[in-house]
Amino acid sequence: TTYRQGEQIFWEIPDSLLGCDMFVTTTILESAAVKKRDEDRRYGYSGDFFGPMIVCFRKEGDEVLLQVPLCDRVGVDPGKGGIHHVARQRGDFMLNEVLPVQAKTSSSVLVEVSRLLMNNPLFNLSPFGFELKMGMVESKKNRIGEIKGFPENILIRSSRSFSVEEYPVGGGNGFGDRYTTSWEIGVCLALLPRQPLERRQKNRDVGYFSFSKTDFSKSRFALSQVSCVKRWRLVPRDLEAYSRGELVEPEKPIVFY
């Protein structure tokens, strides 16, 4: 639940969501009109989509921690020594933000998220600044707009401004052309399924996109790399018919627009 009081924004987070994995995605709703656009430039258009990035909220004492799970390894066994001991020292989460608890009930906590939504890289375009060639942030022109909550996700709309300076071709002592670009973005924070998909290793005979993880399970003293495929969560609508080998529709079909 979102509450607004003047310039302050608060989120009431149920205890049932603390520790649950969520993902953050960013969509450009309105892009800036730039004077010169590189021909090989891939991003910077309305509808461009960035992410996802995985996060979770955890409560420690009177603080709520926004953490980023480190998902680059598998097979770490707390009961083993060797490289497993070194892996445990790194931990499984990276701390991103600390939010003091403003109030709490028996089943939820209230935190202020004004600064988080305005300045944290997870909720703005900063991680994609190189691709977008945005320049310096003009903080005074940034605004958090409409925030909509749904059962499994929340949408945050905001305006972002950046100052861009283009220097003369070939260098020299001349001053560059300086101007401001303005963007409207939509950030989606959505709850991931509590039961993750079973990990499937890459097969060279099947053309899936894949990603690599460091595998600690093969040896106490040596690391190996395992490639996992990227796939959609397709659950058969009629499991019995699917088990008989019949063609069935998924519960949530993939829709392309």
How should each PLM-predicted stretch be described?
Residues T1-Y257:
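Auxiliary tRNA-acceptor-end handling modules of aminoacyl-tRNA synthetases
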